[in-house]
Amino acid sequence: MSAISIETKKVTELTAFTTPTDSCLIPIHDGTSLKKITFANFRAKAVEGTEAKIAPLLFNNAGAHNAIYRGKSLGSTVTTAQYAAIKAGTFDDLYIGDYWTIGGVNYRIAAFDYYLNSGDTNCTTHHVVIVPDTCLYNAQMHNTSSGGWESGAANTTAGGYVGSDMYKSNLEQAKTTIKSAFSGHVLKHRIYLTNAVANGRASGGAWCDSEVDLMCEQMVYGSGIFSPVSDGSNVPANYRVEKSQLPLFQHEPSRICNRATWWLRDVITASSFANVDTNGYADCGNASYSCGVRPAFCIS
């Protein structure tokens, strides 16, 4: 039996087909006559321009992956393949906002290679900066016997962040929790921290090892808000390697406020450190207040 020409049927009379394979043929008119093209070739040509435009966003490097917010759940543990991708600096299938849920805490990707090429000892290790969605617990910057806010001398920023009880002891619980969740993969790197205060301003600092530390205003907001600045005569010791906003907070600002007040490490006055208020605004508070501990750390 001879085949019936397609031209004897209307398009609406043809059998519907929704699962074409690469070898399927599509009739196409090039302006001179009717020809054929495979589905594979048609598809490739149709997306050619789009693929060229989005390709840079899919490159396997920190710059490309810092530019995309995804927010995908990555499960309850970092896989061997994921650690390998971090180590290689390709960050395959890892994007800003992705998170692991470990011990009831969402640990969310905030940046890729944020500290690379910084520090008095150069950071050359590829890494991912992680920030928990919630505060791990509450603690004071300066401890009191009551465990809560007290007036007067209890509120001091003497010694800066390095001299605070938060730095010296109150972060230990967070370090234990985080090192258990990411065993053997918490990166030790070098950052510059305040260790002296004069007239309510940071007046000195030093390079320190960092594994788990409070964030600073620049990491959260993209700039200083309450931190004292140069007035033309006095220049506060605001030296830091964290000069830019974490991509997590840049792409999704709602991640800054978690409906709790949590500490930042910046010295604001002789008695107050910076914090993020429960209502979402930038704030500062007396050192003896017990506020949330929401630290940042790197895995590699």
Please annotate each region the language model reported.
Residues S2-G49:
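Extracellular repetitive beta-rich solenoid segments
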Residues E51-S300:
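Collagenous Gly-X-Y triple-helix signature in extracellular proteins
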